Amino acid sequence: MRIALGIEYDGNGYFGWQRQAEVDSVQAQLERALSIVANEPIGVFCAGRTDAGVHATGQVVHFETQAIRNEGAWTLGVNANLPDNIAVRWVKEVDDSFHARFSATARRYRYVIYNHSFRPGILRHGVSHYHGDIDADRMHQAAQALLGEQDFTSFRAVQCQSKTPFRNVHCVNVTRQGMYVIVDIAANAFLHHMVRNIVGSLLEIGLGNQPLTWMGDLLALKDRNQAAATAKPHGLYLVDVTYPEQYQLPKLALGPLFMLD
């Protein structure tokens, strides 16, 4: 039996999604909880591997099991065995053609900037704090240069293992909600650190340190050293993964927090 899960997690305190020896990860905690409920060893496959400190409201995973449980038993049982900062949002049995990573047609991330003179307290691990006068409209205008299938070498991490730097950005929007600036971006897939590197450069434009044309210039240069520093991980959320309609996976509010879909 193949089962898909929708999960959310606070990435603070974890060394990213992927299971690693001697450090804690979201994958390790989820597999431990699933194995307890299934009463057999469980390994999971995810839609996108998030880095240390990065969060998710819409991560999707799948796993194989011989255990027979109803959806309520999976949800309640797994959540009872997970840490408080990881939770299953939905469960669905899927056919064997479904793969959390390879069946996905798009991923969507939101990066939340707390734009205020003083640092936050309660949300300190859920937003990235940047002071200064950030012009969200200017960031949005500049970000449109990223649309379409392009070479994102200037925005990939040095240690990125992808065979190709080409990705297809479907949409990107930058908006302001009070003291929060939100960068919302969807693509067929993302390179390692791609979203955070894009946000770092957009911030330079929003602060008036670079011209509106800079994102296009960076794409043309194909040189990571020419772009801005990588934005901090705390404000980044994987909020949605798109799959073909045939799988009929549940659709819930994207989040995080108060944000509208």
UniProtKB/Swiss-Prot annotation:
Binding, substrate: 109
Purpose of the protein: Formation of pseudouridine at positions 38, 39 and 40 in the anticodon stem and loop of transfer RNAs.
- Write one Gene Ontology MF term: tRNA pseudouridine(38-40) synthase activity
Q: What is this protein called?
A: tRNA pseudouridine synthase A
Show the catalytic activity.
uridine(38/39/40) in tRNA = pseudouridine(38/39/40) in tRNA
Instruction: List the Pfam families.
Output: PseudoU_synth_1
Q: Which residues form the active site?
A: 51 (nucleophile)
